[in-house]
């Protein structure tokens, strides 16, 4: 199987990329999976040598992103939220059932301070601690309240020194998975598995004022709500169905729940979190 990584705006031409044979055997159930795999391999090969192409889904064309123009209650607080997948951007653009646009940008991160939450030095609880800080509508039971406090005291990363954050996107269904872990109803292993459902991939969030000068608008492509609103709804529905099936599976006695994390005073660096 061969995928082509498209030419960048500055003319840097990646070569044809052969996908390893092991990926051929994976059941690719989502329409944008191949695009996501190709992007991941391309980024690994280029190692940041080339500027990135990112997309922002919105109801209108955004030629000049506005610093702190988003909601503070987004996953990582104020920021300009983008993805490397034009298909996902179109879904986000039509999330209210109306037509929108996938705005295309060139982004150069080489001189920026980037926090990649999916890199080996971090774990899913670092991501979750940030989510508990910025997202609202968490359960109010005692375990959930204690869990939020524990996560923020032991796993919260100071994002102020960073210009850009790369990490999971907590769409509605994915946020509910995170809520279940914080409430103590699913294990850490099941949360990690759930975050891979639906192939949402990563989002790239421009946080600092300096980072906004590293984004250049290229163009915008219309997103038809009759197509992409349904795709987003289907993705969410299938992820929830898959999650419910996974949730019914018997937990191993060795699996970690949030209450175990608190009782055993587990912190960053514990091998059980990897």
Regions found by a protein language model. Name each.
Residues 59, 86, 109-111:
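Short, flexible loop/turn elements at secondary-structure junctions
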Residues 24-75, 103, 263, 268:
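ADP-ribose/NAD+-binding catalytic cleft of ART/PARP-like enzymes
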Residues 13-16, 22-28:
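Short hydrophobic targeting helices and cationic amphipathic motifs
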Residues 38, 96-100, 109-274:
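Conserved NAD+-utilizing ADP-ribose enzyme module
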Residues 71-96:
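Extended catalytic/binding region for NAD+/ADP-ribose chemistry, centered on the ART fold
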Residues 10, 14-15, 37, 41:
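Intrinsically disordered, low-complexity segments enriched in serine/proline and basic residues
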